[in-house]
């Protein structure tokens, strides 16, 4: 089944991203038997000393929230997007709670819906601290944590559900009932993390070279941070394993940023890598080299050049045919990291509220980090068609 653009994090909307880039002199080097490594100092001692103690600490933290609130007062695009989030949250509250219903062998649709719901409800809760929203988040978490499992035979399902539950815990910052917090942490351990240590199970993604690596390792990192105080040994071991495993997928961007699975899967896999980068930066003050990994930033231009004037893709492999009209939120993150503001299409995100709230891809919302973009001269992008013609000549 072809994966759709990731149902990720609405917290990407509105966030003033505070990058803490890895020192250029701290080159972790390459393993002659594998890809260039990320920095990996992770241990129980490192986890206990370096992990931010207060919540939220995943993508959002107190510093980022302060900047976010400032944007909500001053930026009309951010204001427009937040209204769309509010509308989505209202619609979610009218829906029934999720049930464990497989489609074929997959639970992925349920996991993605849970991730969407946590993003929308969680962002509204962070801004408004509404008891009604908090109660609905509690109900959503209890419902999915009472599933018999999260379908580990198809680990994407586990990964996206784990990220959803981890964010629900983090963004409610201890305000859920103690029984729910304990249930959620136990579920993250037993249904999320531990099945990934089953050698007979579906664990090839750990050092895989496609989007499964990016999605599943990202989900395990989020889950590990959420349960760090409950089981620091398991958390540190799992984060360390993911930091060792992720380069096997990140190396696929080399040498020029071209993604082997095409533009559609670039959107899915890359969106999880940028979310993972953001989670690590907000929680530890560093992403251990993800954003600076060779050719990773170059891939943003690949994404741009795969877009045709007709709104279709120059596609290959099992890439889809047509891109979303809802804006490219992953490219918006690259705008904050590279200074290339054209990667962030503000006019697209200033669409009608109803349109934004009903786009499936609105589940992942843009990063607004203009204050943090480095000042640099931005090259004009050639038209994709002309580039392709020039390439042939």
Residue ranges, per PLM feature:
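Carbohydrate-active enzyme catalytic cores, enriched for enzymes
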Residues: 204, 227, 268-393
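Extreme N-terminal leader/anchor segments
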Residues: 25-83
């Amino acid at each position: 089944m072809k994966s759709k653009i990731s149902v990720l994090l609405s917290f990407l909307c509105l966030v003033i991203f505070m990058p803490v880039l890895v020192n250029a002199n701290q080159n972790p080097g390459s393993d002659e038997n594998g890809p260039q490594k990320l920095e990996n100092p992770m241990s129980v001692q490192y986890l206990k000393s370096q992990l931010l103690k207060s919540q939220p600490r995943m993508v959002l933290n107190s510093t980022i929230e302060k900047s976010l609130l400032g944007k909500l007062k001053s930026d009309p695009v951010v204001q427009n997007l937040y209204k769309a989030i509010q509308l989505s949250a209202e619609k979610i509250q009218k829906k029934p709670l999720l049930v464990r219903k497989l489609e074929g062998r997959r639970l992925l649709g349920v996991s993605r819906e849970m991730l969407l719901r946590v993003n929308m409800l969680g962002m509204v809760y962070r801004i408004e601290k509404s008891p009604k929203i908090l109660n609905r988040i509690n109900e959503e978490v209890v419902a999915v944590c009472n599933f018999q499992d999260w379908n580990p035979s198809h680990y994407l399902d586990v990964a996206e559900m784990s990220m959803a539950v981890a964010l629900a815990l983090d963004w409610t910052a201890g305000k859920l009932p103690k029984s729910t917090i304990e249930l959620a942490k136990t579920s993250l351990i037993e249904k999320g993390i531990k099945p990934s240590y089953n050698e007979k199970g579906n664990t090839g993604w750990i050092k895989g070279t496609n989007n499964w690596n990016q999605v599943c390792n990202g989900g395990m990192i989020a889950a590990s941070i959420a349960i760090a105080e409950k089981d620091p040994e398991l958390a540190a071991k799992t984060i360390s394993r993911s930091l060792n495993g992720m380069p096997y997928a990140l190396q696929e961007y080399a040498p020029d940023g071209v993604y082997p699975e095409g533009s559609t899967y670039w959107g899915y896999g890359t969106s999880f890598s940028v979310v993972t980068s953001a989670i690590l930066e907000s929680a530890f003050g560093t992403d251990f080299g993800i954003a600076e990994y060779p050719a990773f930033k170059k891939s943003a231009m690949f994404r741009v050049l795969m877009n045709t004037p007709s709104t279709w893709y120059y596609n290959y492999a099992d890439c889809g045919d047509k891109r979303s009209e809802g804006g490219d939120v992953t490219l918006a993150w690259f705008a904050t990291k590279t200074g290339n503001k054209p990667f962030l299409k503000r006019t697209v995100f200033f669409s009608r509220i109803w349109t934004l709230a009903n786009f499936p891809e609105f589940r992942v919302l843009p990063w607004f980090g203009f204050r943090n973009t480095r000042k640099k001269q931005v090259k004009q992008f050639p038209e994709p068609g002309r580039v392709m013609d020039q390439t042939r000549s």
